[in-house]
């Protein structure tokens, strides 16, 4: 590590501490030439995978697009911004944990649907209708049935 004061490359680590979150190491260093001390921080830098679109083109992952998709589906629904941010973070953690360098956009769409299913069932059906390109009312009905899960014995769906 170069000294920020004199530019000398010979420095010595005097003290190292892990942050409370456990994701950063703080190091106190001393320059062996000018004897001045300085602090450095070390943390893992993880790269999000590239996104492979349906047409085969590739683009950088954009958390803003994921957040926008979630927010649009959740528009006028009782879900807080913090819950949306947490959903985006879970999607990103899943993508990073996969270790993949490239991920199909369809996989991100499925992750978004999973988060919406957990957050708000109406928003899930909204998103699914666009994402899966519903063509008729039957596809909406099927998505709603999927959300309701198995019927209890003796219960029937109303056909109104």
Curated annotation (Swiss-Prot):
Keyword terms of this UniProt record: ATP-binding, DNA-binding, Metal-binding, Nucleotide-binding, Repressor, Transcription, Transcription regulation, Zinc, Zinc-finger
Gene Ontology MF terms in the entry: ATP binding; DNA binding; zinc ion binding
Zn-finger segments (unnamed): 3-34
Family annotation (Pfam families): ATP-cone (PF03477), Zn_ribbon_NrdR (PF22811)
Domain ATP-cone: start-end pairs: 49-139
Necessary cofactors: Zn(2+)
Cofactor-binding details, from the entry: Binds 1 zinc ion.
Function (record text): Negatively regulates transcription of bacterial ribonucleotide reductase nrd genes and operons by binding to NrdR-boxes.
Similarity field: Belongs to the NrdR family.
Stated name of the protein: Transcriptional repressor NrdR
């Amino acid at each position: 590590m170069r000294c920020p004061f004199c530019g000398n490359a010979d420095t010595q680590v005097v003290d190292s501490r892990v942050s409370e979150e456990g994701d950063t190491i703080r190091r106190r260093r001393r320059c062996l030439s000018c004897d001045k001390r300085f602090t450095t921080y070390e943390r893992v830098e993880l790269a999000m995978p590239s996104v492979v679109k349906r047409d085969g083109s590739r683009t950088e992952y954009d958390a803003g697009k994921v957040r926008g998709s979630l927010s649009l589906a959740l528009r006028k629904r009782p879900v807080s911004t913090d819950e949306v941010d947490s959903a985006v973070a879970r999607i990103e953690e899943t993508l990073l944990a996969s270790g993949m360098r490239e991920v199909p956009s369809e996989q991100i769409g499925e992750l978004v649907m999973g988060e919406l299913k957990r957050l708000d069932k109406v928003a899930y059906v909204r998103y699914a209708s666009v994402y899966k390109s519903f063509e008729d009312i039957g596809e909406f009905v099927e998505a709603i049935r999927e959300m309701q899960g198995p019927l209890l014995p003796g219960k029937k769906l109303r056909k109104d």
